[in-house]
Amino acid sequence: DRYYTRRQAELLDKQIDDPNIITTFAMRYGNPSIKKMLTHLQKAGCESIVVLPLYPQYCAATTATVCDEVFRVLMKMRWQPQVQIVPRYYDHPVYIKAMVNSLERDLERLEFEPKQIVLSYHGVPKKYLQKGDPYHCQCHVTTRLIREQWPYKDIPIETTFQSRFGPQEWLQPYTDETLEGLGKQDIDSIMMACPGSVSYTHLRAHETAM
């Protein structure tokens, strides 16, 4: 994640092209940490900060922890800049269009014609949904909007959830079980994508490939 997140920040900085705006990144669980980056911005004299969580769909386990950590760090600093948090953008037209365009480019690079597209989102325990977390619903809305703009209507698109562990029930359908089921239906050419994170993840790609 770190490599791609850094590259995104670098490319965004080039696009903004404003010497008065610092475009950088921080990791929730890694380096540079949110604390380290906020300290850097303080020393740089920043008075206004825009925080962009790289999770299109809101979840208490992801987006909320980023926001919590930002304000937890600021509470202990004698520096209170104006802070704006970019809200969830799971249904934003620009995001949806970018996902569709990305899928089309990937489809053109394939050496086979897929019979099915599986959109695999990072899973969370089902109890999150039962407590009112909107993540599950927002993932399905993202898939629906992608499906509506997808030009190849003969290739169906399905939502699944991956990365579960432990004995408790997680969001379903599970990615691995879905792939097994498709194989039993003789659907042997499948295209997969993970639209639940703006930053590409090797771990998730490897996991789903397994």
Question: Residue ranges of each PLM-predicted region?
Answer:
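Redox- and metal-dependent alpha/beta enzyme cores, enriched for Fe-S-associated oxidoreductases
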Residues: 126-153, 165-173, 178
